[in-house]
From Swiss-Prot:
Plays a role in maintaining adipose tissue function through the regulation of ceramide levels. Mediates the stability of ceramide synthetases, CERS2 and CERS5, and their activities. It is found in: Golgi apparatus membrane. This is Progestin and adipoQ receptor family member 4. GO terms for cellular component: Golgi membrane. It is a multi-pass membrane protein. Keywords: Golgi apparatus, Membrane, Transmembrane, Transmembrane helix. Belongs to the ADIPOR family. Disruption phenotype: Knockouts adipocyte-specific show a normal phenotype. Upon high fat diet, body weight gain is comparable to widtype after 18 weeks. Liver weight is reduced with diminished steatosis and brown adipose tissue mass is reduced. Animals show an improved glucose and insulin tolerance. The gene is Paqr4. Interacts with CERS2 and CERS5; the interaction regulates CERS2 and CERS5 stabilities and activities and is inhibited in presence of ceramides. Induction: Upon high fat diet, expression is induced in adipose tissue but not in heart.
Amino acid sequence: MAFLTGPRLLDWASSPPHLQFNKFVLTGYRPASSGSGCLRSLFYLHNELGNIYTHGLALLGFLVLVPMTMPWSQLGKDGWLGGTHCVACLVPPAASVLYHLFMCHQGGSPVYTRLLALDMCGVCLVNTLGALPIIHCTLACRPWLRPAALMGYTALSGVAGWRALTAPSTSARLRAFGWQAGARLLVFGARGVGLGSGAPGSLPCYLRMDALALLGGLVNVARLPERWGPGRFDYWGNSHQIMHLLSVGSILQLHAGVVPDLLWAAHHACPPD
């Protein structure tokens, strides 16, 4: 993975101000690089390498796993939901890889700001498109309510996405997505008490999905474990890498719930009113 001799790496104090967002990661910062220099950093050790590969390898796996395990031929008119689900699973790790790979670009803060916005758009997409099949299946037998719920959640997601894009800090970005999480919990609650429908085993997957995502966000905001040992987790095992792994698990739980849900919706006959 890391087999080239890279440039002289910087410490936290010497890195550009826009990259000084974690004061507990003390070393391993790449110097300002050209586009080709950023690509070359795939092959030498630095403090973003783990972030790049955790989501890069996950993206390669999702590119195979998600489309191949989606039962396209059985979805019928709900095939568009399979498409939105694939986008929801693939865009976040792709945006994350681009963000972490090119964040040291010599274009400086303006380029970094655009990359951060791209990364936030990926998070917003998984929160938005990822929930549409869940809402669709939960309200499968309430056709009068389903369109309003889908449009309402989409509008809420637009507000959450804007707040995340304009948030001044990591904790503010996490709070921006809280409204979407709250709306999903209402949907899960409706399903849990019998007011909603869906495949029997999907709800636990969705609960694990949001639990993993929340845990990852909290670990990232708390800067753990590097807060307990500044400099000890500069390259491996820091909070952002842990968040990446938890987010991969969250997407896998989403996929594990959506596939049986869509199959259930395709074959289930709602009782007459």
